[in-house]
Amino acid sequence: MNAPDQNQTVRATDLTRQFGERVAVDKVSFELHRGEVLGFLGPNGAGKTTTMQMLTGNLAPSAGQVEICGIDMLDRPTDAKARIGYLPETPPLYRDLTVNEFLQLAGRLHRVPKKELATAVESAKQRCGIGDVGQRLIGALSKGYQQRVGIAQAIIHNPDVVILDEPTVGLDPNQIRDIRALIRELGGAHSVILSTHILPEVEQVCNRVQIIHKGKLVFADSLGGVKAFRGRSLMLGLRNAPPIEAIAAVPGVAQVELARGGMFRVQPAPDTDPTDALVQAAWDGKWNLFQLAPAVSSIEDVFVQLTHREEHA
């Protein structure tokens, strides 16, 4: 029997959740290790929030298993949840408390020993850049500072796993930059799951990416793997380009988008490879083909390909 992986902090196995006849999450499996910052992406209604609720122990799965640092969430929920810090999309803040009062309350709720509470509060404040606002009412703080307080309550007990749900929504550009820097810093000491709709944010702060669509995990790789993802998209370069409708009419082509410099992004139809047909059409039509290659993908490219292909099939 293999020894348990001491660096593994989250393990989800065939995680499934049904609501009546509807399957919201369908056999989702993945692992997370120390030092990893995972970007968790999905369209609205894809099952992302349901998955987050199961990971944090707020919703029981219909089937499957969640383990936090080797602790089964269903068998030992209190012990498993003690290893998690969670910031919901709407931070659970008491606006009439000072920052210090709120973090002391959060520490007690997380069962930080009384003799360690003051140190834990100061450490969380310093890490989150709120050391100078401890005596201020939370309701008097800017949204950016309130988000920092929300993250501070999530890490006050020094959890192994930090889960952040849309932490930069509604912030101004400077606040967004600061929160992203904080998330990168958290990734050095914790495992972080970042749920966001802001795709460039994942490229800036995460080293792993997962995409869920219609309840199924459709992509899981490192950030480097995103760029290597060939998917189905092709880049077509023509010096004597015809109307875009002529390219779209080539057998096996499902969609064409104009890029720049005589470049077109071509989306093949399902289970087809239009490469030969495009070359032949370019020759016959004297389109002066100078490039035809798989597109180098961004997170946005991968996201669009994987979450829209069924709708356009």
Where in the sequence are the language-model features?
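C-terminal coupling/interaction segments
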Residues: 2-4, 270-313
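ABC transporter nucleotide-binding domains
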Residues: 7-12, 17-213, 219
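Non-catalytic surface loops within mature trypsin-like serine protease
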Residues: 34, 132, 240, 268-270, ...
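A short linear hydrophobic-aromatic micro-motif
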Residues: 129, 252-257, 288-293
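ABC transporter nucleotide-binding domain
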Residues: 178-269
